[in-house]
């Protein structure tokens, strides 16, 4: 691939005439031009391109630098030293060349550019051109090329004196100044760019961008940590679930061999059905049991007791018998049943069930001889806390299910009974309203106490009739019955009406009694 010339050289080539004479003259001058081109190629100046252009160091649209100026001056001086011959010299040389054989002059060595531009002193071997004198003619016959009428031009060289020390110093100073100026300009340009870059970096916009970038980086790191922690948690949960599944499978495999042809899904469906059936069965049993407790006779009031009495009976007796003198020797409960008339059905409450005497789980309470029928609606009823439903009567009224409502360990032994001073302190610390209400009542009618221990929303309660309650018959409802229904008030005739935890269903636990509520 050759180099392309400029448009000016192309136009010049078009308008240049190409005649035969010019071609002949060009053919004659070809060896000289070739020799000159070789010398110029060696020196590196004026190299011609393909289309006749010269390769100059000076650009077209740029002012030459100091180094280029120095090099151009050196080239100009070299051109002055190398002067072409005059026409007279050409004629003389042509005559001598025809008369005498061809003598080829030796071209003197011209000092190169580096020796001219360098501040070092030029050696005399390089500075002075060597002149070769013509050799004597050889005895050989002349060659046909020498006899030919070709004209050989002879060149003359002018002796160049050696530059003085001042000239060398001036050249060295110029070169050093040019080089130092170039280095200074380059360093100044770099420093100028650095200062501009620092000004941009230290500006407010760059600081704001940096702060935003740091915030985004912090947010990104936070999101990445959250995602990583969530993934780790998911992996831990999955591993835990897999571990539980393997344990479940191993526990199932440890059982007997399963010969069924059912799939795992069918087995799971059947298992869920069994569980649902068990839950429904328990609910239905609880519902039926609660209704059974509601419909039972009030006979269970004398059965569900600790040693024949409820848990709160000791506190009731203590409130009733505060006016009575304290006995150091506790009385024993009477095991003989009270006489029962045809139109009266009551229970005698003895003083033996105070906190000073321990309750015995083996004590019995004789039930009435005649069965008590279920009362009519809107009459008092006490539910029995037993599953038997009154089918069979036993000598001991304490049933197996009585442990749900009676707790014998809560009764205090005799040596832990409160003394007179302790009772006085308890009475002093009690509520003043209760002390004011404790007014003495007449002997024929005792004070009535009502303690809503149970839940009224179940419409159930327990009734304990006193000596003054009037019952016309076992099957007839009394006028002083306690009716615990929704949106109804508590009615009672006599000296005692207590709603106990016996009336609560099996699904609801007992609540502790709060005397200050």
UniProtKB/Swiss-Prot annotation:
InterPro entries: DUF4005, IQ_motif_EF-hand-BS
GO biological-process terms attached to the record: plant-type secondary cell wall biogenesis; regulation of secondary cell wall biogenesis; response to calcium ion; xylem development
Phenotype of gene-disrupted mutants: Formation of abnormally large and round secondary cell-wall pits in roots metaxylem vessels. The double mutant iqd13 iqd14 exhibits larger secondary cell-wall pits.
Keywords: Calmodulin-binding, Cell membrane, Cytoplasm, Cytoskeleton, Membrane, Repeat
An example molecular function term from Gene Ontology annotations: calmodulin binding
Cellular-component GO terms for this entry: cortical microtubule; plasma membrane
Composition-biased stretches (Basic and acidic residues): 432-448
Primary role: May be involved in cooperative interactions with calmodulins or calmodulin-like proteins. Recruits calmodulin proteins to microtubules, thus being a potential scaffold in cellular signaling and trafficking. Regulates the formation of oval xylem secondary cell-wall deposition pits through microtubule-dependent lateral inhibition of Rho GTPase domains, thus confining the area of active ROP domains within the lattice of the cortical microtubules. May associate with nucleic acids and regulate gene expression at the transcriptional or post-transcriptional level.
PANTHER family in the cross-refs: IQ-DOMAIN 5-RELATED (PTHR32295), PROTEIN IQ-DOMAIN 13 (PTHR32295:SF232)
Designated name of the protein: Protein IQ-DOMAIN 13
């Amino acid at each position: 691939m050759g180099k392309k010339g400029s448009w000016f050289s192309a136009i010049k080539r078009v308008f240049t005439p190409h005649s035969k004479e010019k071609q002949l003259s060009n053919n004659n001058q070809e060896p000289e031009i070739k020799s000159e081109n070789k010398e110029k190629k060696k020196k590196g100046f004026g190299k011609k391109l393909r289309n006749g252009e010269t390769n100059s160091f000076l650009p077209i649209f740029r002012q030459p630098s100091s180094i280029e100026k120095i090099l151009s001056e050196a080239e100009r001086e070299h051109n002055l030293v190398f002067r072409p011959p005059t026409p007279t010299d050409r004629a003389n040389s042509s005559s001598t060349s025809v008369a005498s054989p061809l003598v080829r002059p030796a071209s003197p060595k011209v000092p190169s550019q580096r020796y001219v531009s360098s501040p070092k002193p030029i050696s005399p071997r390089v500075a002075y051109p060597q002149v070769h004198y013509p050799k004597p003619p050889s005895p050989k016959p002349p060659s046909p090329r020498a006899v030919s009428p070709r004209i050989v031009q002879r060149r003359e060289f002018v002796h160049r004196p050696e530059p003085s020390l001042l000239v060398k110093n001036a050249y060295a100073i110029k070169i050093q100044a040019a080089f130092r100026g170039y280095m200074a300009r380059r360093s100044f340009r770099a420093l100028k760019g650095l200062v501009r870059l620092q000004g941009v970096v230290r500006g407010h916009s760059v600081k704001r961008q940096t702060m935003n970038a740091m915030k985004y980086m912090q947010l990104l790191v936070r999101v990445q940590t959250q995602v990583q922690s969530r993934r780790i948690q998911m992996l831990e949960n999955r591993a835990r679930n897999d571990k539980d599944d393997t344990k479940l499978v191993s526990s199932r495999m440890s059982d007997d061999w399963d010969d069924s042809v059912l799939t795992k899904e069918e087995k799971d469906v059947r298992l869920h059905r069994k569980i649902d059936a068990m839950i429904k069965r328990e609910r239905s049993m609880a519902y039926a049991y609660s209704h059974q407790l509601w419909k039972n006779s009030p006979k269970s009031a004398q059965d569900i007791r600790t040693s024949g009495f409820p848990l709160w009976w000791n506190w009731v007796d203590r409130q009733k018998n505060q006016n009575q003198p304290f006995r150091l020797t506790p009385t024993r409960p009477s095991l003989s049943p009270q006489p029962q008339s045809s139109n009266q059905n009551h229970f005698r409450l003895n003083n033996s069930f105070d906190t000073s005497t321990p309750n015995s789980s083996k004590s019995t309470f004789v039930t009435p001889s005649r069965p008590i029928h279920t009362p009519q609606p809107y009459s008092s009823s006490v539910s029995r806390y037993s599953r038997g439903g009154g089918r069979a009567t036993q000598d001991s009224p304490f049933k197996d299910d009585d442990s749900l409502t009676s707790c014998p360990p809560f009764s205090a032994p005799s040596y832990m009974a409160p003394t007179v001073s302790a009772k006085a302190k308890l009475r002093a610390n009690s509520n003043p309203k209760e002390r004011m209400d404790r007014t003495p009542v007449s002997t024929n009618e005792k004070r009535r106490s009502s303690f809503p221990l149970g839940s009224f929303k179940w419409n159930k309660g327990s009734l304990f009739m006193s000596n003054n309650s009037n019952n016309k018959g076992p099957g007839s409802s009394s006028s002083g019955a306690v009716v615990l229904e929704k949106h109804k008030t508590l009615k009672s005739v006599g000296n005692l009406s207590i709603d106990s935890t016996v009336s609560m269903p099996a699904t609801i636990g007992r609540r502790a009694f709060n005397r200050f509520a």
